[in-house]
Amino acid sequence: MYKTWRLCRTHTVGGLCHDGSHRFVSTGGAKIGKKFENMNQIRDYLSRPVWSVHEYLGINTKEEKLEPPSAEAVKKLLRLSGLPLEGADIKEIQMRLAKQLSFINKLHNIPVEGEKHTKEYDARLVQRNTKQLNYTKLLEGISHQKQDAELGEVSGSWKATGLAAESKNAYFVVKEGLLKNRK
C-alpha cells in the first residue's frame, strides 16, 4: 500500500510541533479513496453504518439458549460495583449480562484477515512473550539515551531536589514529625 514509512518530527517555534507529537509521513503516493471536499461529506461518510450491533447481539436467539450468570454472581457484582441490592431485578440483570457476554464472545470469534500479523499487535488481555527487564538492561538502555538539544533538553540541567525545602547530598530530607505537627 505505502512504499515507505518514516517517523519524523515537525519543528516549529521552540522546536516542538503545535501538538507536541510525532508525525508519520508517507513517502509513497498511496490513494485510499476520493478526497473529501467539505465537512458534510465527512459527516455523511461517518454516519453510514458499516455493520450493525444487532448482527452480533443475537436478538433472534431465544433467551433460553443464553446462559445467564448465577444470582449469587450478580449479587456479588452489584456489591463490588457499589450498586444497591434492594429493589434490583436480579432476573433482568442476569439476562442483560447474558446478552452482553454473548455479544463479547461473538466479537472474539469474528475472523480477522491477516490474523498472524495482528496477533503481534493484539491489545486484548493475552499473555505476551516479552523478555524480562532487569536492572542491568535498564542501566544499559539509559546509557544509550541522549538529550535532544532541538527540544530544549540540556544534559544535567534537572535537579530532583532543587525545589525541596531541605536536602543533603542530592537526597531529600524527611523528618519524622512532618505530618504529626501540622497546623
UniProtKB/Swiss-Prot annotation:
<dbReference type="GO" id="GO:0070681">
    <property type="term" value="P:glutaminyl-tRNAGln biosynthesis via transamidation"/>
</dbReference>
<dbReference type="GO" id="GO:0005739">
    <property type="term" value="C:mitochondrion"/>
</dbReference>
<keyword id="KW-0496">Mitochondrion</keyword>
<keyword id="KW-0999">Mitochondrion inner membrane</keyword>
<dbReference type="GO" id="GO:0032543">
    <property type="term" value="P:mitochondrial translation"/>
</dbReference>
<dbReference type="GO" id="GO:0030956">
    <property type="term" value="C:glutamyl-tRNA(Gln) amidotransferase complex"/>
</dbReference>
<dbReference type="GO" id="GO:0005743">
    <property type="term" value="C:mitochondrial inner membrane"/>
</dbReference>
<keyword id="KW-0067">ATP-binding</keyword>
<protein>
    <recommendedName>
        <fullName>Glutamyl-tRNA(Gln) amidotransferase subunit F, mitochondrial</fullName>
        <ecNumber>6.3.5.-</ecNumber>
    </recommendedName>
</protein>
<dbReference type="Pfam" id="PF20977">
    <property type="entry name" value="GatF"/>
</dbReference>
<dbReference type="GO" id="GO:0050567">
    <property type="term" value="F:glutaminyl-tRNA synthase (glutamine-hydrolyzing) activity"/>
</dbReference>
<keyword id="KW-0547">Nucleotide-binding</keyword>
<comment type="subunit">
    <text>Subunit of the heterotrimeric GatFAB amidotransferase (AdT) complex, composed of A (HER2), B (PET112) and F (YGR102C) subunits.</text>
</comment>
<keyword id="KW-0436">Ligase</keyword>
<comment type="function">
    <text>Allows the formation of correctly charged Gln-tRNA(Gln) through the transamidation of misacylated Glu-tRNA(Gln) in the mitochondria. The reaction takes place in the presence of glutamine and ATP through an activated gamma-phospho-Glu-tRNA(Gln). Required for proper protein synthesis within the mitochondrion.</text>
</comment>
<dbReference type="GO" id="GO:0005524">
    <property type="term" value="F:ATP binding"/>
</dbReference>
<dbReference type="InterPro" id="IPR027499">
    <property type="entry name" value="GatF"/>
</dbReference>
<comment type="similarity">
    <text>Belongs to the GatF family.</text>
</comment>
<keyword id="KW-0648">Protein biosynthesis</keyword>
<keyword id="KW-0472">Membrane</keyword>
